[in-house]
Amino acid sequence: MTMTHLNRLILISLLFVSLLLKSSTASSTVVDEGNRTSRNFRYRTHRFVPRFNHHPYHVTPHRSCDSFIRPYARSMCIELQRIHRSSRKQPLLSPPPPEIDPRYGVDKRLVPSGPNPLHN
């Protein structure tokens, strides 16, 4: 092997080891269920951060928007709750039961009325 291939191999192995170390330290920085050592750590969406509370505006079912201290966070919480409430759709009405054609004893087919869309 030439010297450049050896240097490239060493560089790749060092990068791999540093990534492994970084991922292991990121998972160990969580002190307990809510407290974290870094102020910005809770804003990360890293794969080692628990999925249930990885977003700064995540509202748990027992938490109200009044518990947020910052006004922006509180207004964002209220807005997200409003969006969530409006996104819940009413259950769709079931389609009417099919009409049976008395002449043939089969379901009636709906025929569109109005102008022919294929006619120019």
Curated annotation (Swiss-Prot):
Region (Disordered): 85-120
InterPro entries tied to this protein: CLE9-13 (IPR039618)
A cellular component annotation (GO) from this entry: apoplast
Sites carrying sugar chains: N35, P115
Signal peptide (residue range): 1-26
GO biological process: cell-cell signaling involved in cell fate commitment; maintenance of root meristem identity; phloem development; regulation of cell differentiation
Keywords: Developmental protein, Differentiation, Glycoprotein, Hydroxylation, Secreted, Signal
Family statement: Belongs to the CLV3/ESR signal peptide family.
Protein name: CLAVATA3/ESR (CLE)-related protein 9
Organism, as annotated: Arabidopsis thaliana
